[in-house]
């Protein structure tokens, strides 16, 4: 953990978790833990964000604020002025969609809402200002570790202990 904190400049108010289950498990773990109001905004840019959307819909309302589905996910849509309801719990992106080969060059304007990012295919490949995010996760088998493990970097204020309706895993 110390090495990762040093390498990424992870602030002290973030926890670093090493979890089994891989990145796909985070598609459901994130909405189960972060949807306080039952609403999240997702940006659909390819196969991975599409799968994350499907899982999040099982936990609450999902608003797809921007999508590149119209051109078979060949671009990242303009995210400078997204329609984000005030009671949105978080904004979710897959920052690098490997199947269609698109990546964000600029983070979306979340208008003060928590930004959640799947960085599986780009984890540790370039500098990342962790403070721009509420939560970052990455399946480490693509870049830095064994299959079936994920690194989650989460801001401490997002960790909840008031949830008694979650599965045991």
Where on the chain are the PLM-derived regions?
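Conserved PLP-anchoring active-site segment centered on the Schiff-base-forming lysine
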Residues: 35-50
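Active-site C-terminal subdomain of aminotransferase-like
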Residues: 140-169
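A short secondary-structure junction signal
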Residues: 75-77, 101-107, 125-131, 147-150, ...
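General beta-strand structural signal in soluble alpha/beta enzymes
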Residues: 16-20, 42, 64-67, 93, ...
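Active-site phosphate-binding strand-loop segment of PLP-dependent enzymes
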Residues: 56, 68-123
């Amino acid at each position: 953990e110390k090495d990762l904190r040093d390498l990424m400049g992870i602030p002290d108010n973030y926890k670093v978790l090493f979890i089994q289950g891989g990145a796909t498990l985070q598609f459901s773990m994130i909405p189960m833990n972060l949807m306080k109001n039952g609403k999240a905004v997702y940006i659909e840019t390819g196969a991975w964000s599409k799968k994350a959307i499907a899982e999040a819909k099982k936990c609450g309302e999902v608003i797809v604020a921007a999508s590149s589905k119209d051109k078979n996910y060949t671009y990242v849509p303009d995210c400078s002025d997204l329609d984000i309801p005030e009671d949105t719990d978080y904004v979710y992106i897959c920052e690098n969609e490997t199947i269609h080969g698109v990546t964000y060059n600029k983070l979306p304007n979340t208008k003060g809402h928590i930004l959640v990012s799947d960085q599986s295919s780009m984890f540790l490949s370039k500098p990342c200002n962790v403070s721009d995010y509420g939560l970052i996760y990455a399946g480490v088998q693509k870049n830095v570790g064994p299959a079936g493990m994920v690194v989650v970097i989460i801001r401490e204020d997002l960790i909840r202990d008031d949830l008694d309706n979650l599965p045991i895993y």
